[in-house]
Amino acid sequence: MRRSLVATTVLALAFAAPAAAGLPKAGALVPGRSLGGIRLGESPQAVRAALGTFYGTCRGCPRRTWYFTYRPFDKHGLAVEFTDGQVSGLYTLWQPAGWHAPHKLGFGSSPLAVHTLTGASRTVTCNDYEALVRDSAHARTAYYLFDGRLWGFGLFQRGASPCR
């Protein structure tokens, strides 16, 4: 009986750990530190442990890039870029519901709110959108604007272009 209970517990824990991995329902941007719970410099193994193995791979991207979404072919989620085997960039895909930054800054906020609440003071113009950026010691945090509203978040190595 005791062996059976131990074996059942071990099996339950083994199957529970992978089930816990996945894209967060309400991911958070921690400026200069993390996006969706993933930090710059993490290994692919650490990303898989946190987000699971349900991701697509970008075939035309200059860096190895994984797209984590909530359902197959869904546009909403998180992109994770790798350089030399480490996370070098993270950005939201479209506007995943519930994702936010500090001060309750969410998608749809005005550029003025982004400037005021984040201190992002530099504007980088990309092809069809803009990014308000703020550099910290080791990272660049990006607040993407489209059509005059906050559209997404990004986190990159310091000085990296936020344009994708």
Task: Identify the residue ranges that each predicted region occupies.
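Sec/Tat signal peptide C-region and signal peptidase I cleavage site
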Residues: 17-21
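Bacterial N-terminal signal peptides that target proteins for export
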Residues: 1-6
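Bacterial N-terminal signal peptides
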Residues: 7-16
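A short, ordered amphipathic alpha-helix with a cationic face
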Residues: 22-24, 88-91
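Second-shell loop/turn segments in exported
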Residues: 31-38, 98-105
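A cross-family detector of function-defining hotspots
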Residues: 42-86, 95, 105-164
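N-terminal periplasmic "start-of-domain" segments of outer-membrane beta-barrel proteins
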Residues: 26-29
